[in-house]
Amino acid sequence: HFKNIQIVFNPEFLTEANSIEDFKNQNRIIIGGPRPATTKVRRIFAKAFPKVPIIKTGSTTAEMVKYFTNCFLATKVSFANEMYEISKALNIDYDKVTEYAVYDERIGKSHLNVPGPDGDFGYGGHCFPKDVMALKSLAWELGCSPRMLEATDSKNNDIRTNRDWETQIGRAVINIKD
């Protein structure tokens, strides 16, 4: 019935709080799928975002880029929260520690605020928790041992009070006009 349908995977890298601005100011666009379909989609994006790199790849690679990004940032949040706890135990200013640490450009400034933008510790929302759990599950199915993802998830479960993702199961589409 559907042999002429070609599906393209285009992961978004948006934050819930700034989704429209994030969309307008993308730093890259990933398009995964069969070549004829990705070529058509690339043309559409190239007109709207002429200065943004557009990367065409396979669907699985595009999906893994999304998981990699979200799981890396979730791990960074868990790590930052742990450094916050240690700084607090040493009676030193965590904000000064991060201010001086990010002089090393390899670290990057994002995702180091503790508590986070919602005033809670750890990460919430529906993307990071969902993606960490999904990639952990996939890794186990593939015979891999996702110890880092296990630690990230465990740390978050220990420190996060607002477990908002538990009430957002199945939420994938929002109406941005409201």
What feature does the model see in each segment?
Residues 88-178:
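NAD(P)-dependent Rossmann-like dehydrogenase/reductase catalytic/cofactor-binding core
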Residues 2-11, 15-110, 138-145:
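Internal alpha-helical scaffold of NAD(P)-dependent oxidoreductase catalytic cores
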